[in-house]
A protein has these predicted regions:
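Active-site-proximal beta-strand elements of phosphoester/diester hydrolases
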Residues: 1-10, 113-115, 140-149
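N-terminal, active-site-proximal structural segment of metallo-dependent hydrolase catalytic domains
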Residues: 1-83, 87-94, 98, 255
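Active-site beta-strand/loop signature of hydrolases that rely on acidic residues for catalysis
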Residues: 20-48, 70, 104, 132, ...
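Extracellular/periplasmic catalytic domains that process cell-envelope and extracellular macromolecules
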Residues: 30, 59, 94-97, 123-125, ...
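Short, solvent-exposed loop/turn segments at secondary-structure boundaries
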Residues: 46-50, 154-157, 237-238
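Residues that flank catalytic or metal-binding motifs in active/ligand-binding sites
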Residues: 53, 61, 97-100, 126-130, ...
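Beta-strand-turn-beta hairpins that frame and shape the catalytic cleft
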Residues: 97, 101-113, 124-145, 252-255
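Metal-dependent phosphoester-hydrolase catalytic domains
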Residues: 109-120, 133, 155, 162, ...
């Protein structure tokens, strides 16, 4: 959300959370959501008016939820970023809130795991993923939701995905790996796709599908990869403007 003033911030964010909840249930721009993955899910920061986004959105949706905070270091100034990433309102250096990743689900979440990712390029924003298991009928499915560093070169991003891939190899369950991979160049898209496909994952999203935008740029940042289950339908929920990302969605068939 690009907001310039703290005046009225709590009410504005409350309305945005409610708008997102409606979009995820009314079935117009995307099917009714059963599992929702959030990245940059703020928890009582000034920029979100003190709201806990994951908790409040889960309450409106009637979902179970799990959130892992990034653990942003206090008082550490952010490093200079690429110009196309510099529009984001930063979290205040002394803000007592935090951001993070979250999973929301209509089914109970089991075996919730925090996964810390190696991060070098952006010393003020630790990177992480969250994993959890849901039971669809008699079949368990493991879900990994990651927020990859946009500042890192391809090798740095793949090093983060390697940590997640190692975690996925520890389970024999069908697996979904998704999130904001910040593949903000065609080369990053290609190498990320090749990395996961080499490990048995598939995705229906064509390389270059716009999911993130500024006023002048549209890029493919967000992905859903699966192994052991099948994606039957998929899409990008445009023009749902509750974030600088358009939500991506997939209907997954579990045998």
């Amino acid at each position: 959300m690009g907001l310039m003033s703290l005046s009225g911030r709590p009410e504005h964010v409350r309305r945005q959370i409610s708008a997102a909840a409606r979009a995820f249930t009314e079935g117009k721009l995307l099917p009714r959501v059963d599992v929702l993955a959030l990245q940059e899910a703020d928890m009582r920061t000034k920029r979100t008016g003190g709201h806990h986004v994951a908790e409040e959105l889960a309450a409106e949706l009637g979902m179970h939820w799990a959130h892992e905070a990034a653990g942003i270091p206090r008082g550490v100034k952010p490093v200079k970023r690429q110009w196309w990433l510099d529009f984001e309102e930063p979290i205040d250096l002394q803000d007592t809130g935090d951001t993070g990743v979250a999973l929301l689900s209509r089914l109970p979440l089991k075996d919730v795991t925090r996964i810390d990712l190696p991060w070098q390029e952006c010393q003020w924003r630790p990177r992480l993923a969250i994993a959890a298991t849901i039971s669809v009928g008699t079949q368990d499915v493991r879900i990994f939701n990651a927020h990859v560093d946009p500042h890192a070169a391809v090798d740095g991003q793949l090093a983060q995905l390697e940590v997640i891939a190692t975690q996925t190899e520890a389970t024999t369950l069908p697996t979904i790996v998704l999130g904001d991979f910040n593949t903000l160049s065609r080369q990053k898209c290609i190498e990320t796709r090749e990395f996961l496909e080499a490990r048995g994952y598939t995705t229906p999203f064509p390389t270059g599908t716009p999911t993130w935008r500024t006023t002048v740029l549209k890029m493919h940042a967000d992905w859903i990869f699966v192994r052991g289950v099948k994606i039957e339908r998929w899409g990008v929920a445009k023009p749902l403007n509750v974030s600088d990302h358009w939500p991506i969605w997939a209907e997954v068939a579990v045998e």
